[in-house]
């Protein structure tokens, strides 16, 4: 889901995560961006054409429609075609650093140079759907409350498909079981084998029950979006 590498903002006297309003969340994120600005390194030039020659390690899973992974539980691998390039680089970097715990992805990310990541990310960014079809379905009242509770649109943008920062993922249309597993991972802390380390997403995910996360994931998966699976046959 979201990858933010800004310094952790002091939480003294801060409201509980479930009480954070959309306005407060946006203000918090803007402060984080400002604090981090001095530590950011220049982005590498991205070459989508070069990336097309580097995706062999990706298509074995992400190029097969409906392909399932088994770690940490069975779920469809995420659709990455159409995802933002900066987010893809951010996610790969998190796997390489161990901030996202996944043995296969850490091995793959560890074998990639920064330039490889930039090129592969650029390639997948331009492989999304030409246009999202139709409007998002109206959520059930209970789901609408969950979306409000999580302040999802505050970061992931309109229809959860236009993130306010390119390092955040597009969510609309993503596989429900993947979203559920990813959200649960943010509830897992200080485990050397599973989980994801991200201060903002950890704070947002923890107040939800698994039943609520499943309902939220199912609705987000039903939303039209840019993401898709580019068939492996495309690369032969």
Regions found by a protein language model. Give the residues of each.
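Short, Lys/Arg-enriched N-terminal segments with co-localized hydrophobic residues
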Residues: 8-24
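Bacterial N-terminal signal peptides that target proteins for export
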Residues: 23-31
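Bacterial N-terminal signal peptides
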Residues: 32-39
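Sec/Tat signal peptide C-region and signal peptidase I cleavage site
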Residues: 40-45
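Sequence/structural segment immediately N-terminal to covalent heme-attachment motifs in c-type
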Residues: 46-68, 135-160, 175, 233-236
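His/Met- and acidic-residue-enriched segments that coordinate or traffic transition-metal cofactors
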Residues: 53-59, 63-68, 83-87, 94-97, ...
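Gly/Gly-Pro-rich "capping" loops immediately C-terminal to redox-active cysteine motifs
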Residues: 65-96, 106-111, 145, 153, ...
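C-terminal capping alpha-helices of c-type cytochrome domains
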Residues: 110-132, 177, 204-232
